[in-house]
Amino acid sequence: MLFRSVYFDFDSSAVKGEYKPVVEAHAGYLKKNPQRKAQIQGNTDAQGSREYNLALGQRRAESVKSMMRVLGVPENQLEAVSYGKEKLRATGSSDADNAENRRADVAYDGE
């Protein structure tokens, strides 16, 4: 089973080293399955304005997408979108809840 989420530090769009294997696994899957397409969905915690979080979510999605491109995934298999703070996974406001929401999710076509 592939883990679907890459988590980020507060106000960051840099993929942390511990999540590079997750990105590499998805890149490998996509290269072996050229008919599949992936949407990388950038998300943020609830802190900050809607506009800022949409931009941050987009940077997170683009960061994962760029890493996949470097790993050899063709552009036409990837789409980066931002949901900002619209798709919170954890609805509380603790540090742990906020950390759970700072992520990029990989979703495949047909899912």
PLM features: residue spans?
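Short, small-residue-biased leader/transition segments that mark boundaries at the very start
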Residues: 1-2
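Second-shell loop/turn segments in exported
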Residues: 9-15
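Short, conserved glycine- and acidic-residue-centered signature motifs
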Residues: 19, 53-61, 99
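Extracellular/periplasmic catalytic domains that process cell-envelope and extracellular macromolecules
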Residues: 31-33, 97-100
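A non-catalytic structural micro-motif
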Residues: 34-43, 58-89, 102-111
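Short, exposed beta-strand-loop hairpins at the edges of beta-sheets
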Residues: 72, 95-98
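Short beta-alpha junctions and helix-cap segments that line functional grooves
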Residues: 90-94
